[in-house]
């Protein structure tokens, strides 16, 4: 009889334990219904929607993700702006005292992408639209100087900005340096409107050979009857002239120009120094002379490229033969060469 009684008690204990486990399971309910945990750089409101029992607590391991509300139905948090280049992650944990769930909060880095080859926008005197590509995570401001707003405006679109340029009837070159900024990032653009014939005249100048700086005096640019241009006295006191064509509203000087006899029995060649510092004689390769606007609003004419792949400078090379096959030496290397009116740079 006692043995049967002990068996009966054992069965009751098992039933009681099972009942306790069922009760505990029902009291520790923590079901996830919906989440919003991925964010752009601009940040925003996130949430974890749930069904739960018990006392809900939440914790996050970074200060840029801030808990706003915690209750049995929802955990709400706010992700701050990310102005950095890199994306970032946070860990959010939710618990009801028995069960715990963990969530990764992901935020992408800030984007400010612009065309590095679009910083110089040169155009003739006709009314025109100059498009540039620009992508930004944040809203950006476009600052056109007050003195240029009468003739220069802009329109934003999904791909970037369209600069709207009115017809130039002033009879002189005009330009503006436009700053575009988003948070702590920015880009500057030069918009210059002019007639290419304004590059003709007599100019002073300066250049570097990579070691020292030198001055230039009375460099002359003339337009020919056939529409081409001649530049003379770039080698001060020597009679050599460089030929150029008007391309993209600049004067383009082709490589490989045979300038003729140099010191009786030698020959002189105009060649281009490429961006990777090779001497180039291919006539299809050119270096351009065009206006650049200084911060004080004045203009200089620069033998400088707009793109990173544009030529680094130009060089006059001495050869033994008229076919320019046997080079002897460099006569002069021109880097960062600019031309200007005498009263511009003192």
Enumerate the predicted regions with their spans.
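Short, solvent-exposed loop/linker segments at the N-terminal edge
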Residues: 38-43, 120-126
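Short, hydrophobic beta-strand segments
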Residues: 77-82, 134, 163-169
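Short beta-strand edge segments in extracellular beta-sheet folds
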Residues: 104-112, 122, 188-198
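A short beta-strand micro-motif common to beta-rich folds, especially ectodomain repeats
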Residues: 86-98, 171-184
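Surface-exposed binding patches on compact interaction domains or structured appendages
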Residues: 45-76, 135-162
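Proline-enriched interdomain boundary motifs that mark the N-terminal boundary
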Residues: 27-35, 110-119
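Bacterial Sec-dependent N-terminal signal peptides
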Residues: 2-5, 10-42, 97, 102-104, ...
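Ser/Thr/Gly/Pro-rich, low-complexity flexible regions
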Residues: 192-346
């Amino acid at each position: 009889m006692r043995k049967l009684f002990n068996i009966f008690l054992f069965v009751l204990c098992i039933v009681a334990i099972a009942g306790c486990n069922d009760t505990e399971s029902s009291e520790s309910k923590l079901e996830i219904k919906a989440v919003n945990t991925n964010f752009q750089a601009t940040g925003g409101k996130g949430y974890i929607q749930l069904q739960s029992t018990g006392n809900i607590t939440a914790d996050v391991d970074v200060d840029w993700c801030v808990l706003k509300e915690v209750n049995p139905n929802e955990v709400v948090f706010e992700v701050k702006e990310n102005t950095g280049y890199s994306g970032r992650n946070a860990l959010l944990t939710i618990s009801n005292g028995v069960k715990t769930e963990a969530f990764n909060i992901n935020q992408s880095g800030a984007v400010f992408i612009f065309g590095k080859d679009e910083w110089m926008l040169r155009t003739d005197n006709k009314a025109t639209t100059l498009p540039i590509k620009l992508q930004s995570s944040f809203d950006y401001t476009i600052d056109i100087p007050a003195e240029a707003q009468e003739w220069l405006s802009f329109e934003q679109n999904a791909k970037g900005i369209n600069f709207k340029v009115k017809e130039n009837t002033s009879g002189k070159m005009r330009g503006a340096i436009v700053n575009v900024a988003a948070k702590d990032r920015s880009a500057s653009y030069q918009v210059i409107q002019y007639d290419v014939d304004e590059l003709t005249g007599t100019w002073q100048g300066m250049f570097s050979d990579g070691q020292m700086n030198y001055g230039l005096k009375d460099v002359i640019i003339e337009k020919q009857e056939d529409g081409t241009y001649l530049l003379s006295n770039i080698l001060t006191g020597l009679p050599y002239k460089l030929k150029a064509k008007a391309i993209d509203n600049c004067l383009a000087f082709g490589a490989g120009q045979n300038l003729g006899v140099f010191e009786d029995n030698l020959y002189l060649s105009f060649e281009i120094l490429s961006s990777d510092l090779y001497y180039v004689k291919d006539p299809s390769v050119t270096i351009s002379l065009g206006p650049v606007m200084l911060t004080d609003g004045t203009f200089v004419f620069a033998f400088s490229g707009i793109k990173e792949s544009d030529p680094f400078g130009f060089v006059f090379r001495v050869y033994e033969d008229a076919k320019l096959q046997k080079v002897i030496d460099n006569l002069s290397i021109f880097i960062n060469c600019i031309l200007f009116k005498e009263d511009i740079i003192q």
